[in-house]
Amino acid sequence: MQGSVIEFLKPNLVGIEQINATRAKVTLGPLERGFGHTLGNALRRILLSSMPGTAVTEVEIDGVQHEYSTKEGVQEDILEILLNLKGLAVKLEGKDNVLVSLTKSGAGPVTAGDITHGSDVEIVNPEHVICHLTGNAEISMRIKIESGRGYVPASSRIHTEEDERPIGRLLVDATFSPVERIAYSVESARVEQRTDLDKLVIDMETDGTLDPEEAIRRAATILAEQLDAFVDLRKVSEPVAKEEKPEFDPILLRPVDDLELTVRSANCLKAETIHYIGDLVQRTEVELLKTPNLGKKSLTEIKDVLASRGLSLGMRLENWPPASLSED
């Protein structure tokens, strides 16, 4: 069938070759000459930089104050452990960030499967090695995992001097993209008498948290949405009324008494006019340790109780307190 000389061919999905659970080849064609590289390069850049995913952003290891130290009984130094933690492949369900914990003792490897987490967390690579213990050594750590996009260096998340970054909180460079490798090639294609057409072949590998086929679909959707504004430059879009969402997580509006702390810890917080959980999470460890009669034991209790609810000290809450919140 002979088409118009100005009519563009519309590509169709030629095939998907699933090489393994994390790698696939997607073939798209036929494409007009030159469009193989045009679409291939655009999709490649989006897949590498714009796919949402999860990453470890903060780590606290008992007995470790900074990343340049070592821990007795652990073969790897702290920098190696942080690097290994970056290799965790995690899925989060219904949450943007979570705190998980890991405690292990005795000689042998410490793997991602040793991490204690809730039902809203799935570790895709439980066999991933984090470190190795010798003798009767023990290691205990708390790991913060967040959702995000692209690459966010630790330097961009370091607290200001006014925030007094807590000692022992180790920030990690976060690579959120689930796409680990992608390459594309353009091959020749033929339709009837035309032999100058392109066929795009995308070879992609992910960390297992995102199916390669779904990743291609998301990248194409992002590209289409970004180009949609150019379809009708004169079109004036009307503002869409957004559904109002709670300004703060309801748990932050609850009184500190709901944490069921010991009497000593609760009284210390009330003496500092810390009445709501939202007041508490904005305080840093250094600030709390300056509170009269509040020692390290009480601080550990507070941190553990917050961690069990997916919270931590040193959080930033914009526009706190809300106008509707009444002071005790």
Swiss-Prot record:
Reaction it catalyzes: RNA(n) + a ribonucleoside 5'-triphosphate = RNA(n+1) + diphosphate
InterPro entries: DNA-dir_RNA_pol_insert, DNA-dir_RNA_pol_RpoA/D/Rpb3, DNA-dir_RpoA, RBP11-like, RNAP_asu_C, RNApol_insert_sf
Lineage: Bacteria, Pseudomonadati, Pseudomonadota, Gammaproteobacteria, Alteromonadales
Protein name: DNA-directed RNA polymerase subunit alpha 2
HAMAP family with a match to the protein in the record: RNApol_bact_RpoA
Cellular component aspect of the GO annotation: cytoplasm; DNA-directed RNA polymerase complex
Function: DNA-dependent RNA polymerase catalyzes the transcription of DNA into RNA using the four ribonucleoside triphosphates as substrates.
The enzyme's E.C. designation: 2.7.7.6
Region described as Alpha C-terminal domain (alpha-CTD): 248-328
Keywords, sorted A to Z: DNA-directed RNA polymerase, Nucleotidyltransferase, Transcription, Transferase
Family listed: Belongs to the RNA polymerase alpha chain family.
Cysteine disulfide links: none
GO molecular function per UniProt: DNA binding; DNA-directed RNA polymerase activity; protein dimerization activity
